Amino acid sequence: ERFSISESTRANYARGEDTYDPVLSQAVVFPETNEEVSKILKMCNEHKVPVVPFGTGTSLEGHAVGNQNGITISLEKMNNVLSLNANDFDCRVQANVTRKQLNEYLREDGVFFPIDPGADAALGGMAACSASGTMAVKYGTMRTVVSGLTVVLANGDIIKTGARTKKSSAGYNLTNLFIGSEGTLGIITEVQ
């Protein structure tokens, strides 16, 4: 249930909605926490196993194509809203919460998440790809609305970037370093 080498499961996680030929990874794993992603990446780093993160698979650019010598980490079980501060227009979600799921959650508080790339993408993938959409002129892009991330680095280290404050001049803006990094610097597991 949390680890699969079956061909049918691997085929389901071999590509997104792009036109690239699917590539089956050796296995698909389904972590539920940052710590589980960390353990997986530590092992993969130690044994030099390539990793492909997989959210909802809505990518049109080949981000979700598997690696025949590696594993796919499906974030589908990391789909919870962790906190909401409606008065501050701020929430923290796990990476596989979709924009529609988040907006359903936010509706009763009279707020909404404005980034709409067209597909019902996961917020972790939207951050990794620096998504925008039809309302970007008014509300900005992912780079504008995301104030912090939790990222698991290739060596398994878990880092938190940013803060709940809207303005800060303390230190490097690591949040914007990871937004748009396409998963090359680490796996985004939480978005704030």
Each language-model region and where it sits:
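Feature of Fe-S/electron-transfer and energy-metabolism proteins
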Residues: 9-12, 30-36, 43-46, 60, ...
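Short, basic and Ser/Thr-rich N-terminal targeting/leader segments
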Residues: 45-47, 54-56, 121, 145
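Residue-level detector of anion-binding/catalytic polar loops
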Residues: 49-50, 112
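N-terminal flexible segment immediately upstream of the FAD-binding catalytic core
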Residues: 1-42, 58-89
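FAD-binding subdomain of flavoenzyme oxidoreductases
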Residues: 80-84, 91-192
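Generic beta-strand/beta-sheet core signal
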Residues: 6, 54, 74-76, 116, ...
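Glycine-rich, histidine-containing beta strand-loop boundary motifs that form or position
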Residues: 53-57, 64, 95, 115-117
